[in-house]
Every structure is written in structure tokens, then in C-alpha cells.
């Protein structure tokens, strides 16, 4: 189905399924939630953080007393990088992710259902459209993205939304 609406708010956003999720065998469950919601996977790969890439991605936290814990956690095992696409994808994914602290996250969100920690919190999700674009460029090259039609698309949105 072709998009007809010039005002369609189709966006891409980044999700990082963190090492703690992989260690707990939750990666498939986490990814499945986004697919079931109707978000489309347009890029996906496993990745191992380096000190440099961790400092770049978490630049706003470098210098904080807890940064070394984040760095250690993110480098402990591979992560899964996922680019998701959908209308208002950034906001939708953030809502599905839940509060940063697993103890405060609402039941029904990824963090609310799967974690108790503030730092070992299963998933990273871009917090704005601008950051999503920047983060996607940080981890993916243009050729990593795939455009494809899905037969479910007409059932996910009303005709005037697309």
C-alpha cells in the first residue's frame, strides 16, 4: 500500500537490546512486542560496544559517578541494534519501553515486566526524533536499511493516516 498522506508521521527510531536482556534470553520477547504492536524492523544487527562508542553514545553521562557501571554493563556482552519504523515510532517505542527504572516502570511496559534495575534495564530507546536520527547514523550505514511492504500495513493504520 502506498503512502498517500503527505503529513504522514512515519519515523524510524533506534532500540538497543542490552547485554542483560541477551543474558536473560529476553531478546526475542522484547523484539516480538514491537512487531506485534505494528512497528516494522527496517535494520537489525548484533554489535559489541567499545569504550569509544560507549562514550560517544552516552556522552551526556560521561563524568557521572555511575558512568563506569554503564560502560561495564554495555561492554559485558553483545547488544542487538534495531531500527524500527512506524507512525510516531519514537513516542510509541518510548511508551512501550517504560520508565528508566525498572522498579518504577508500569506493568505492561518492557521494563515494567522484565527488570528491577535502573541500569540493567533491558533496553535503550531513542528519546526524541532528533536523537533517533543521530543514533541511527551512529550505528547503521545507509545500506543497512531495508524498505519493504508488509501485508499487515493496511490493517495497522486508517487510510487517512498513511
State what each model feature region is.
Residues 2-162:
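Non-catalytic terminal and connector segments of soluble metabolic enzymes
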Amino acid at each position: 500500500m502506498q503512502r498517500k498522506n503527505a503529513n504522514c508521521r512515519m519515523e524510524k527510531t533506534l532500540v538497543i537490546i542490552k547485554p542483560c536482556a541477551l543474558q536473560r534470553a529476553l531478546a526475542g520477547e522484547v523484539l516480538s512486542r514491537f512487531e506485534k504492536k505494528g512497528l516494522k524492523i527496517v535494520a537489525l544487527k548484533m554489535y559489541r560496544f567499545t569504550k569509544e562508542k560507549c562514550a560517544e553514545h552516552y556522552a551526556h553521562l560521561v563524568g557521572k559517578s555511575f558512568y563506569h557501571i554503564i560502560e561495564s554493563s554495555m561492554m559485558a556482552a553483545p547488544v542487538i541494534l534495531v531500527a524500527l519504523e512506524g507512525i510516531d515510532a519514537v513516542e510509541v517505542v518510548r511508551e512501550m519501553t517504560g520508565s528508566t527504572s525498572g522498579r518504577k516502570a508500569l506493568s505492561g511496559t518492557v521494563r515494567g515486566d522484565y527488570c528491577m534495575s535502573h541500569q540493567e534495564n533491558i533496553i535503550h530507546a531513542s528519546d526524541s526524533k532528533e536523537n533517533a536520527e543521530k543514533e541511527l547514523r551512529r550505528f547503521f550505514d545507509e545500506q543497512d536499511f531495508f524498505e519493504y511492504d508488509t501485508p499487515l500495513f493496511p490493517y495497522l493504520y486508517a487510510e487517512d493516516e498513511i
